[in-house]
Amino acid sequence: MTHIRWLFSTNHKDIGTLYLIFGAWAGMVGTALSILIRAELSQPGTLLGDDQIFNVIVTAHAFVMIFFMVMPIMIGGFGNWLVPLMLGAPDMAFPRMNNMSFWLLPPSLLLLLASAGVEAGAGTGWTVYPPLAGNLAHTGASVDLTIFSLHLAGVSSILGAVNFITTIFNMKPPTMTQYQTPLFVWSVLITAVLLLLSLPVLAAAITMLLTDRNLNTSFFDPAGGGDPILYQHLFWFFGHPEVYILILPGFGIISHVVAYYAGKKEPFGYMGMVWAMMAIGLLGFIVWAHHMFTVGMDVDTRAYFTSATMIIAIPTGVKVFSWLATLHGGKIVWHTPMLWALGFIFLFTVGGLTGIVLSNSSLDIILHDTYYVVAHFHYVLSMGAVFAIMAGFVHWFPLFTGYTLNETWAKAHFIIMFAGVNLTFFPQHFLGLAGMPRRYSDYPDAYTTWNIISSIGSTVSLIAVMLFMFILWEAFSAKRKAIATDLLNTNLEWLHGCPPPYHTYEEPAFVQTNFKK
């Protein structure tokens, strides 16, 4: 019966667990690819042999980490597990569609890995720009397999988004208004709306690329009246909301973790937090061309995209200062999730500041496609999204499993990881300012020192990842039972114990909503 339970599951907790395991596995693959990248760049000269294989590894690293690690863990894992529990819903709105959303991902990952294994692989970068992604520069099936992989991952995400939106709107208790749902639920809702609106545009772009490659159309070929810049507009209209999709659930997680370990019953400025996330979601759709400052846009177009991009810093600042205000006056408990959350707040802010630098179109002309950009988005992803995932995972691990992690090991893991990621990515700001371009497998000797330091940092991060695997093994091996949790009134997910029973809220939940002052 076990294989039936896991293959045909319609239970949000089981599907959430599948997502978490799949995401962890993909995370290992993505980490391995990143170690190969840093090994190649650890000294001048070549290690892997040629630029194509290097670019295939870079492309696969990006796709695996985005579509098969961060999104499945944050939206599929945490979303499935927590949204029904926080709402008091018996399950997701469409349980079988939920199962399909998950099972589209392994074939998608298989297609992506297959694309690297046939012909010369897809060495296009994750943006898959034509003409490099066209059938002259990339003959063979590699790019086509990548496109099919993205189609499957996209369908999976769209179905998941529909499911979450329906669940959050329709499956609340009758007396609960939208403004009484927890911030994590809000973050998943806004993320789902972004997915629903942006992914079809990506699907259109890569389908046109597919027909350009195979059916002799010329959407992106100037010889037939097309324009490669059209592809960039379509891709980034998806690509920019996508980066907010990656971080928004993290915002929700951090709000919960900070409030919990500061001993507060709610985060500071609930409504401000909600509206800030909505503002970020909306603004995320009208800034896409800041990725294209170097393609030759009008000065007034550049001025608009610079200003609009800077505006996003305002709601982001609202969130950062609200987290700090939540800490204020609290009885702070220095458990591991709190360390991850504080690391998130600091490092995400650093990444945000370099984002403000890059939003200036005139500066971006110089910094575009240099390691400054790599440093920027790895600060918000490798230290934003990943730190949020770690904060949430360590915080809710007793809920998911009924066991507790070893606090000492978990703190050591945080310290090693913190050192590793900063050592890896901080020097890349210097490389970028010195003009080292991205996506090259070799570099002039002048860049050697910072690259060596960056590669040492990646090895430290690898040790941290391996230590985390050990910590997980230790927890399941020692089987320390989780006993009690604090603040049950405002943290509904813990209500049924650790772990909760297979079915929760089989009868509608009673929710007291008239909070007396």
From Swiss-Prot:
Chain sites annotated for binding Cu cation: H240, H290, H291
Top-level taxon of the source organism: Eukaryota
GO molecular function: cytochrome-c oxidase activity; heme binding; metal ion binding
Entry's transmembrane regions: 12-40, 51-86, 95-117, 141-170, 183-212, 228-261, 270-286, 299-327, 336-357, 371-400, 407-433, 447-478
Alphabetical keyword list: Calcium, Copper, Electron transport, Heme, Iron, Magnesium, Membrane, Metal-binding, Mitochondrion, Mitochondrion inner membrane, Respiratory chain, Sodium, Translocase, Transmembrane, Transmembrane helix, Transport
A GO cellular-component term linked to this record: mitochondrial inner membrane
Family annotation (InterPro entries): Cyt_c_oxase-like_su1_dom, Cyt_c_oxase-like_su1_sf, Cyt_C_Oxase_1, Cyt_c_Oxase_su1_BS, Cyt_c_oxase_su1_dom
Main location: mitochondrion
Cofactor: heme; Cu cation
Iron keyword on record: yes
Positions contributing to O2 binding: Y244
Quaternary context: Component of the cytochrome c oxidase (complex IV, CIV), a multisubunit enzyme composed of 14 subunits. The complex is composed of a catalytic core of 3 subunits MT-CO1, MT-CO2 and MT-CO3, encoded in the mitochondrial DNA, and 11 supernumerary subunits COX4I, COX5A, COX5B, COX6A, COX6B, COX6C, COX7A, COX7B, COX7C, COX8 and NDUFA4, which are encoded in the nuclear genome.
Name of protein: Cytochrome c oxidase subunit 1
Source species taxonomy: Eukaryota, Metazoa, Chordata, Craniata, Vertebrata
